[in-house]
């Protein structure tokens, strides 16, 4: 019997990415409650362990496989880890959309359900972080501050109800997670500013969250510039009541619009996409979906 698929929601960049007072990385992944990518994961018994991810070369399966084996070793079923895991619909890699974290998280959750394991989301995330710097994706209704190196994390506040109208600034480019680790040290001059940004996030006030996200994107553009950033930033400043979100180690940017969406803001942003970017936006949603 084939089990029904499960889905782990993804993300579009980060609300904020910075460092704490010790210089350790802190990531507030912008997890979404609705995404056009809609990944699905199937977990079924087999004669041996296999991981299949559609449209991806075999080497890109290794992280998910390593996470599975970490779980199996930790919970005593390494001798019986015989499953066929198929992952369909993951976002493109190297873009800041959380594809490898989606793959690992969904495989681990699928095995937890299949084997009825008593393992927390915290422990699953720590396993993911053993494999690589990972996004915390398990509670999309919240904004979570996470250390992607050791897996520690804290729920900061509820995610605001926003629509994200986003685009890939460089479709032909990808950014490897490992290649961007040096950005942690380059953020050190902005440590005090990140502290202020974190405080704004903790208020839960949507206007301050939008300001914090925009400021984090501005700081990040000094470190990893994105095509078209200044034009997008200018529009955000003109409109005043929206935010700008960045994939801090990827290629995507997005406008954050509180719901219900202001009609004038939507018109201006639609014109920006039509005339400046000459493409349609990719739409994501955060917070509660009616």
What do the predicted segments below correspond to?
Residues 1-94:
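ATP-binding N-lobe of GHMP and related small-molecule kinases
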Residues 12-18, 37-42, 136, 142-146, ...:
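Short beta-strand scaffold segments in enzyme catalytic cores
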Residues 35-46, 61-68, 81-92, 104-115, ...:
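Long, contiguous secondary-structure blocks with strong helical propensity
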Residues 97-121, 137:
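DPxDG-like acidic metal-binding loop motif
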Residues 119-242, 256-290:
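ATP-dependent small-molecule kinase catalytic core of the GHMP/sugar-kinase superfamily
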